[in-house]
């Protein structure tokens, strides 16, 4: 009696433990059952797998080299039997000449139960157009960048520097060779300095400069002939024209007069004499 009661107690305890046990690792039997349930796939999943396998087989055949024999000919084409790649299965079909066939439809299909392998031309065309589109976009972007670079305005610099109207630049004259065998007249090569028009006009209007010019003009005369020039003495007087004052269009109004460190009046007179000598000899030479 004690044994039976002990067995009943053990059975109830084990049943309670299985019912109450929720924490910890699951038992092996439950794990195996769950794996079996998980391995069982739905029918829709199996159908999709079959369709994908068929599609893969069909796509694998596209683009494979074939070898075969023409079994018969007819007016619109040929009857062929070919092998695909290295497979041993023979395929037979009809090949039509260009312009002698109509697209297969329900009315003219002689074997509607035979599946047809359709070429994925749409996908190939789409991929090619996408690649072309990327290339064309890249070229357009590159062309627009080149055009934008080409349209950048470039400042044009003048070949010869311009001088403002209110400035006078003195010209250094080269020594002129006299035709009558005279010696060269020395020229004082002083550094070039720019003077404003107001200062130049003021210097030209001074009385000492005009009196000096009149004295030089009264001292000698030059005899000009068309054929030859005969000097009367070693020192020959030259005709000098009075300088004209240059009046600027827009005179510069200066608050404080700038100190002039230029040449003296004698050097300006020598320059004027040299210019006249060159002009007279140039006119006589021609």
Curated annotation (Swiss-Prot):
Residues 1-60, 123-146, 181-204 are annotated as: Disordered. Disruption phenotype: Slightly earlier flowering time under both short and long-day conditions. Altered metabolites profile. Residues 20-29, 131-140 have a biased composition (Basic residues). Lineage-specific modulator of primary metabolism. Influences flowering time. Residues 1-10, 30-39 have a biased composition (Basic and acidic residues). Residues 191-204 have a biased composition (Polar residues). GO terms for biological process: regulation of photoperiodism, flowering. Coiled coil: none annotated. GO terms for molecular function: transcription cis-regulatory region binding. This is Protein METABOLIC NETWORK MODULATOR 1. Mailny observed in young seedlings and in emerging leaves. Disulfide bonds: none annotated. It comes from Arabidopsis thaliana (Mouse-ear cress). It comes from the Eukaryota.
